[in-house]
Amino acid sequence: MVLPLNIPKEGKFTNDELIALCLANPELNIERDEKGQILITMSPTYALTSSFNSGLNFEIYSWNKKNKAGIVFDSNSAFFLPDDSMRGPDVAWISRKRWDSLSDSEKKSIPKIVPDFIIELQSETDNIKELKQKMTKWIKNGVKLAWLVSPQTQETLVYFNGKTETIPFGKTLGGKNILVGLELVMAEIIEG
């Protein structure tokens, strides 16, 4: 469940103030949309969703460790995006070349960089319509490949090259030309 935090117009947070808000409230998952609206996701997630998320992170991390192609992030990460939003996906991956272009101070904060790949995992309390809108915003900001994983429907929506494809959990998902060589079957990661 995502709750909007109402802030007077004159009270729009700067990036530094938003980071301070996040640090002062580590138990909350805080994001900002492109209009400056602060969004708070209730924490913690349910046990099953947390387990699924761990499995997804493990698979992407394992592929990346073998290929040494970039950096993997979990659901505690966040990124400042070109539309002025700050978003945190459940899983993110950034190519090594792009990650290495950041300064050390950027790497130690919330960086202004768009992940190459993200995964959003629908929890029991997430609204699928809102998640689909969020996926569209990820793509508009420059994410090259995005997966919306829905244990409820046993499907993954794949966003790539301006198209959306629905892949049933029993079929193989590929990393396209972004995570080259990655192949996963969601049914083997997420129990129905």
Could you say what each language-model-derived stretch is?
Residues 1-192:
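Gly/Pro/Ser/Thr-rich low-complexity, intrinsically disordered segments predominantly at protein N-termini
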